[in-house]
Amino acid sequence: MNKTALKTRFAPSPSGLLHLGNIRTALFNALLARRSRGLFLLRIEDTDQERSSEEYVTALMEDLRWLALEWQEGPEVEGEAGPYRQSQRRSVYQADFQRLEAEKLAYPCFCSQEELERVRKRQLAAGQAPRYPGTCARLSPEEVEGKLAAGFKSALRFRVPSLTTIEFEDLVRGPQRFATGDIGDFIIRRTDGSPAFFFSNALDDALMGVTHVLRGEDHLTNTPRQILLLRALGLPIPRYGHIAMIVGRDGAPLSKRHGSRSVRELREAGYLPEALCNYLARLGHHYEDSGFLDLDTLAAQFDLARLGRAPARFDPQQLHHWQREALARCDLDTLERWLAPVAASQVPADKYQDFIETVRPNVVLPEDALHWAKVLFSEELVLKDGILPIIHEAGAQFFTQALAAVDGSGTDFKALAAQLKQTTGAKGRSLFLPLRAAFTGELDGPELARLLPLMGVARVRQRLQNCVDQSY
C-alpha cells in the first residue's frame, strides 16, 4: 500500500470489556479508513500488565469482528509495523528513552508520590493549575548518579521547552493552541520501567504510520504533550480529531444507570451488529440519509465535517429503533436461528416457524420472543396489571358466550368474534379487549387471528373458562 495512504487506528487497553464509547471510537476510525480506501489498524495497549488481561484481548477482538470492523494491521493479521502489542515493544521504547536522555530532552525524576501530592495541594490552594515544579530538572549529573547508586528508583520526565506555543488543527474542533508554560515536565517512563501513555501511544502512532487519530475529547489535552514528544524524536505527527463524549439524558457521563452496557452484554442480549453500527454511527455524527445503511454506505457517507462538538446523548429507545430496522431486514431463517437459543425449547417444533412469523412485529430482543412463547404455551397465564378489571367488567356471561362460540369456530378468531358480537352485542374495544385480556393477559400484542391457531382449541377454551371463573 502507498506509504502516504490514510491510516487510522483503534488502540484499546485490555483492562475490561469494550463499552459504547470505546466501540464508537473504533467505528468512526474504521469508517474513515474504509471511506478513504485506507487502512484500519488495531493496537493493544497492554503496558500495564497488572490491569491487562488476555481474556479481554480475546473479547475485544471478538467484539470488533462481530461488528464486522475488521482490521488490516494488528494482532492475528500482523503487518510491517508490528508487533502490535505494546508489551512486546519494550526494546523500541527503551531506545528512544535513552536517546531523549542523552540529548538532555529527558531526565530522571526521584520525586515520591507523597512529595508530588504535597506540591499539587499547595498549587491548588494558591489557585494555580497543578504542574510539576521541575525539582529534579535542576539536579546535577553527580546528584543523579548519587541517588541511583543509593538505590533510589527513578521515573523519566520529558523536559518541556519553555515559552513555546503548540498549535494544531483539530479535525473536529478546529484550531487549538496550548502554551507549554501550562503543561509542565511530564513522565514518559514509570519507575518500573514501563512507558507512560503519552509516550508509547504517540511513538507507536508515528512508527506504525498512523495518519489520522480520532479519539475521545478527554484526550485533547494530551495532544500538545504528544506533539512535543514526536517533534523531539523527529517523527511524523498524525492529524488528531477529538470526538464528543457520550452522555446520558441527564448530561452526565454515560454509565450503567443510563442503560449503557458493554458490547458483550449487548451482544448476549440479542442486539444485532447492524443495529448497533447504525445507532453508534449517528451518535455524534449527522447523516443526511436517515434510513438503515449497511457498513459500506455508512463509510461512504461518513464525513469529518459532520462530527458534532456537543456531547452525544445516549438514548436506548433509538437503539431499539435501529434494532427493529435491522430485524425487518432479516429473512425467516436468520430470525429462527437468532431466537432458537431462548425460544425453541418453549415452542412445539411443528409450530416454531408460524410462531416466529406471528410474533415478529412484537419482538425487539430474544427475551421478547421468550415472553410470547410463555404467553402462548404455558399452562398458567400471568396477567399484567390492569387486566383483571377488564375481565371483571366484561363479566362471566361474555366469556360463557365466547366458550359457546369456540364450539363452532374453533381457533378461527374472525368467526369467533363475529358470533360473539351477534350474541352479546359487544363491538369494537368492548369486544376485542376482553378477548385479548383472556387469551394473552396483555393489553396489546400480535394479531389474535394468528395467535389462536398456535394456542390450540384446548388452551383457548381453558383461558376462557378461567375468565368465567374469575368473573364471579
UniProtKB/Swiss-Prot annotation:
Location of the protein in the cell: Cytoplasm
PROSITE patterns according to UniProt: AA_TRNA_LIGASE_I
InterPro entries: aa-tRNA-synth_I_cd-bd, aa-tRNA-synth_I_codon-bd_sub2, aa-tRNA-synth_I_CS, aa_tRNA-synth_I_cd-bd_sf, Glu-tRNA-ligase_bac/mito, Glu/Gln-tRNA-synth, Glu/Gln-tRNA-synth_Ib_cat-dom, GluQ/Sye
Main location, first listed in the record: cytoplasm
Catalyzed reactions per annotation: tRNA(Glu) + L-glutamate + ATP = L-glutamyl-tRNA(Glu) + AMP + diphosphate
PANTHER family the UniProt entry points to: GLUTAMATE--TRNA LIGASE, GLUTAMATE--TRNA LIGASE, MITOCHONDRIAL-RELATED
Name recorded for this polypeptide: Glutamate--tRNA ligase 2
